[in-house]
Amino acid sequence: LTNRCNLRCDYCCVDSKIENKDHLDTDEVKKAIDNIVKINPRTLTITGGEPLLREDFFEILSYVKEKFKGEIILSTNATLIEYSKVDEIIKDLYAIEISLDGYDELSCSKVRGEGVFTKVINLVKYIKSKGFDNIGLSMVVGKNNENNIDKFNKLNQELGTAPIIRNFMNIGRGNENSSRYLNDELDIGYICKGDYTDKNNLTANMCKAGVNQMSIDSKGDVYPCPNLEYDDLKMFNILQFEESILETIFSRDMDVFDKFDNLKTVNIEKCKDCKVNVFCTTCPSKVYTLKNDEEMFNSNCKKMKSILEHIIW
């Protein structure tokens, strides 16, 4: 809904900040919603920036609930939710995802500022007291806080919420602050180690971004996923949506899908002779970042090759 945010997290992949401007007015957002309904996705996530910064947020939320009959998720930092508005928000909502980035006041405040942790935890307890239980709390993981994952999971267990662990992505404001999250030994591949400790978790499949999911930015431009909002990967603008676009997407008859195929490690020249390339870095957004950063590529390659060769052989 917006690229404005009242917080300024140093990892933000879309560089949201309070001084950003909203690009779509209320009528344009409603038109976008009408076109999303035509696409008929299973789930619609309302996000930002911080969506509650929009003065017309509740008008838009009401319109979404009226028009869209699938699962509606609100993604928010929860700092602007007033207790008096909770009933209105949770009515007909499928889930709320709240970014928290910590298991206590100190760990949270390092990213989100003082007082956010207590405010969010109290709000979560209040929402749950209303009988709404489908709440997820998210944490972006980097070298500074990887040891906090167990404590974060324990917090979620105590609250009865779902932990959402997100990998740090070296894009947006995160690109400016990558040294705080990455180093030679703990690069963007390190967090994947837990996924590769069992052969059964290995996969050679690329994700289905652009087909199973799409991301719409604050201008209405549509991309394969939130981490691939680059000009060369723009699919179309939601305000200009036509039914024929769906046929083009499902037939993969768009230039963006050719570029997508080039984000497979098996198609990268320096990866072609690697014996574990089909299992390495199957996330297109990670590959996109690695291709354009030689130092990060080499660091990730060394780390992942060591992990994968150990597991496979």
What are these regions (language model features)?
Residues 1-27:
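Canonical Radical SAM [4Fe-4S] cluster-binding loop centered on the CxxxCxxC motif
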Residues 1-11, 41-46, 52, 213-216, ...:
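N-terminal pre-triad scaffold of radical SAM enzymes
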Residues 11, 15-18, 174, 183, ...:
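Secreted/processed peptides and extracellular or luminal domains of membrane proteins
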Residues 23-50, 54-167:
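Radical SAM/AdoMet-radical enzyme domain recognition
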Residues 130-132, 170-202, 227-281:
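C-terminal accessory region of radical SAM enzymes
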Residues 207-211:
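Short, small/polar residue-rich loop motifs at catalytic or cofactor-binding pockets
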Residues 233, 263-313:
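Radical SAM enzyme core and accessory elements
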